[in-house]
Amino acid sequence: MKSGRFIGVMSGTSLDGVDVVLATIDEHRVAQLASLSWPIPVSLKQAVLDICQGQQLTLSQFGQLDTQLGRLFADAVNALLKEQNLQARDIVAIGCHGQTVWHEPMGVAPHTLQIGDNNQIVARTGITVVGDFRRRDIALGGQGAPLVPAFHHALLAHPTERRMVLNIGGIANLSLLIPGQPVGGYDTGPGNMLMDAWIWRQAGKPYDKDAEWARAGKVILPLLQNMLSDPYFSQPAPKSTGREYFNYGWLERHLRHFPGVDPRDVQATLAELTTVTISEQVLLSGGCERLMVCGGGSRNPLLMARLAALLPGTEVTTTDAVGISGDDMEALAFAWLAWRTLAGLPGNLPSVTGASQETVLGAIFPANP
């Protein structure tokens, strides 16, 4: 069974940077050693946003974007290696999630698409890459997402305490770690995505630092109720979603009925949408004693305060409080999934994704010996 140093690379739906994590992994433990966040050039970020909202690209443009993202991921890995004074031979493999540009797990031909050419990463780092983690699960009838609950269960499950792990990235997803029950998990809906999109359009800021804008506004209840009527929120699990659904166009369609509203009030309403949809799912799932939050949203004081208010009797904390960096959780998970792939172990949980069976995930892109 392969063990040693692994690198995880994650570029999520928030597009706030490439997260790269170095860890030692074996069958007994996962120990994070180092991490960094690598910036995404504005031009690349905009290209990804455009394609996620349905803008048509030529095959040439699509191929170029795939190559550019692969090179970006390789640059991020090489920066971490240099910072840690490591060589390619010191790393067993890289687990690279890729950049999701479309996720459509339902319908006649279910599919998901993550780009960022793994061949570029191998060629530029000299390290074996494991990628394309989601499509095997979809081929077996699953949603292909979320995949991180298996990792949450391995690290954070408790024999007697009802726990849930909440990742608030661009999309929010919940892992249900309930003693005596199969692991559950699904996407609850928008996390930071709509808030980030709104403040970017209104104020040219990548995100609402310390929720300053949202805290200066007031929740527009009719707008909130209008958004909550979206059928995704009442859809039963297993379910997953992404930027191809909850994007700026989705927000604009709801705002048409509310002309002239204060932008800060919209920001406050979007924050409330995130916390209400999360808390409703926590309660529908039977509640928990401890909700551990990770992802960029864990640093948003308004989101954390509202979750605590909406979930009385639940200890709302961050995964940092139990020794796991909330910023690095997903990248660490894909390093762990790469280890499982190389070990020939399944990486999905049918109780989460709805797949017909457990399966080894991913494709292996071997480095030259």
Curated annotation (Swiss-Prot):
Pathway: Amino-sugar metabolism; 1,6-anhydro-N-acetylmuramate degradation; Cell wall biogenesis; peptidoglycan recycling. The keyword ATP-binding applies. PANTHER family: ANHYDRO-N-ACETYLMURAMIC ACID KINASE. Keywords: ATP-binding, Carbohydrate metabolism, Kinase, Nucleotide-binding, Transferase. It comes from Escherichia coli O127:H6 (strain E2348/69 / EPEC). NCBIfam families: PRK09585.1-1 (NF007138), PRK09585.1-3 (NF007139), PRK09585.3-2 (NF007148). The keyword Cytoplasm does not apply. It is an enzyme of class 2 (transferase). ATP binds at residues 12-19. This is Anhydro-N-acetylmuramic acid kinase. It catalyses: 1,6-anhydro-N-acetyl-beta-muramate + ATP + H2O = N-acetyl-D-muramate 6-phosphate + ADP + H(+). InterPro entries: Anhydro_N_Ac-Mur_kinase, ATPase_NBD. The gene is anmK. CDD domains: ASKHA_NBD_ANMK. Belongs to the anhydro-N-acetylmuramic acid kinase family. One of its GO terms (molecular function) is kinase activity. Catalyzes the specific phosphorylation of 1,6-anhydro-N-acetylmuramic acid (anhMurNAc) with the simultaneous cleavage of the 1,6-anhydro ring, generating MurNAc-6-P. Is required for the utilization of anhMurNAc either imported from the medium or derived from its own cell wall murein, and thus plays a role in cell wall recycling. One of its GO terms (biological process) is amino sugar metabolic process. Its EC number is 2.7.1.170.
